[in-house]
């Protein structure tokens, strides 16, 4: 097999997968639809805050499968099967949402099922793809991550158009099936490089300081946890991520409540917000 060509197929498949699962950032479009149809869906009115908790759970569980995903590659015999698992869970979470009658069911369907699916797929598409491109690791990680953000640029207007025409629950079903099919097909092209494989003409840096950077040394995970700088870094990440996720996940109801936008315009605003998220 020509692995120099294969790696580009892996990159494209990973980008397509991340675009699909990245629509999780467009939750606010679903949330607005659920809020408007809350009486028919839940049998009573619910608040925006109660609905927003589904996205909070979806994002909050993400670290668990991301950490477990690397170990699952051995259990499931490769990254392709982990992405398949992620795609099936993500699709199942969206489709299961059409059967909900309570907020707790929403939290399980979208928050847990879809959340675990997103994280399983995302953790593999980034880490595995970078293995194919040690010569361009920063660029490739950026492209793969940007694709995750791009999902919430492309799909919000489509989501809102479907909600306006069919309602929010059929939209969950339509998109759940569509995403599942696309991810399963894309995952077929995702594989891991052979052990020790390197691109033609690439020679990796060797030695502790050369690999880690001038004046620095590599740390194992135990040493990392013992370093106070690790916790400061985590705190900075949490602060920045919290602000960003608040805006990204509530773009639609915020623009309607504060700016007086209609649902279609609010969906476009969500896409515009996602442009900044993707660019970053």
Outline where the language-model segments fall:
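Central cavity-lining transmembrane alpha-helices of secondary-active solute carriers
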Residues: 53-72, 271-280
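Extracytoplasmic gate region of multi-pass secondary transporters
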Residues: 27-34, 140, 220-280
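Intracellular juxtamembrane helix-capping segments at the cytosolic ends
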Residues: 34, 111, 118-133, 137-141, ...
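Helix-breaking motifs and short loop linkers at transmembrane-helix boundaries and internal kinks
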Residues: 39, 77, 99-101, 134, ...
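Juxtamembrane helix-start elements in MFS-like secondary transporters
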Residues: 42-55, 107, 141, 261-270
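Conserved MFS/SLC helix-loop-helix module at the cytosolic interface between two early adjacent transmembrane helices
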Residues: 64-104
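Hydrophobic core of transmembrane alpha-helices in multi-pass small-molecule transporters
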Residues: 19, 93, 104-120, 238
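Helix-loop-helix hairpin linking two adjacent transmembrane segments in secondary transporters
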Residues: 147-195
């Amino acid at each position: 097999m020509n692995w120099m060509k294969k790696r580009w197929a892996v990159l494209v498949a990973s980008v397509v997968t991340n675009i699909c699962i990245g629509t999780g950032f467009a939750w606010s479009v679903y949330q607005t639809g659920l809020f408007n149809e809350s009486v028919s869906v839940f049998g009573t009115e619910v608040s925006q805050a109660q609905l927003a908790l589904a996205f909070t759970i979806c994002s909050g569980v993400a670290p668990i499968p991301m950490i477990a995903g690397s170990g699952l590659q051995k259990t499931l015999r490769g990254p392709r099967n982990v992405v398949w698992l992620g795609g099936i869970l993500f699709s199942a979470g969206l489709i299961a949402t059409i059967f909900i009658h309570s907020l707790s069911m929403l939290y399980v369907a979208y928050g847990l099922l879809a959340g675990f699916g997103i994280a399983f797929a995302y953790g593999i598409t980034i880490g595995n793809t970078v293995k194919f491109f040690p010569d361009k690791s920063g660029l490739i990680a950026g492209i793969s991550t940007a694709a995750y953000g791009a999902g919430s640029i492309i799909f919000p207007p489509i989501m809102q158009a479907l909600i306006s025409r069919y309602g929010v629950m059929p939209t969950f079903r339509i998109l759940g099936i569509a995403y599942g099919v696309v991810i399963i097909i894309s995952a077929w092209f995702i594989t891991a490089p052979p052990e020790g494989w390197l691109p033609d003409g690439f020679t990796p840096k060797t030695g502790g300081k050369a690999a880690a950077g001038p004046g620095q040394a590599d740390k194992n995970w135990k040493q990392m946890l013992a370093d106070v700088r690790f916790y400061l870094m985590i705190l900075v990440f949490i602060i920045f991520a919290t602000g960003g996720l608040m805006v990204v996940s509530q773009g639609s109801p915020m623009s309607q409540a504060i700016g007086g936008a209609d649902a279609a315009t609010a969906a476009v605003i969500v896409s515009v917000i996602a442009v900044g998220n993707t660019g970053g």
